[in-house]
Amino acid sequence: MTDFNLPSIFVPLIGLFFPAIAMASLFLHVQKNKIV
């Protein structure tokens, strides 16, 4: 019931949210060290 709907919600959420955090953390790391 709810178990069937959870994967269809979490898969795209994780798929979009995890790369967004990775890009944000990388951007902040570059800005903090002033590599660019």
Swiss-Prot record:
Keyword Plastid: yes
Domain of life (superkingdom): Eukaryota
Any single Gene Ontology cellular-component annotation: chloroplast thylakoid membrane
UniProt subcellular location: Plastid, Chloroplast thylakoid membrane
Gene Ontology biological-process entries: photosynthesis
Membrane topology value: Single-pass membrane protein
TM region positions: 6-28
Pfam families in the record: PSI_8
Annotated keywords: Chloroplast, Membrane, Photosynthesis, Photosystem I, Plastid, Thylakoid, Transmembrane, Transmembrane helix
Claim: Transmembrane helix is one of the keywords in the record: yes
Family (UniProt): Belongs to the PsaI family.
Function in brief: May help in the organization of the PsaL subunit.
Protein name, UniProt field: Photosystem I reaction center subunit VIII
Species annotation: Amborella trichopoda
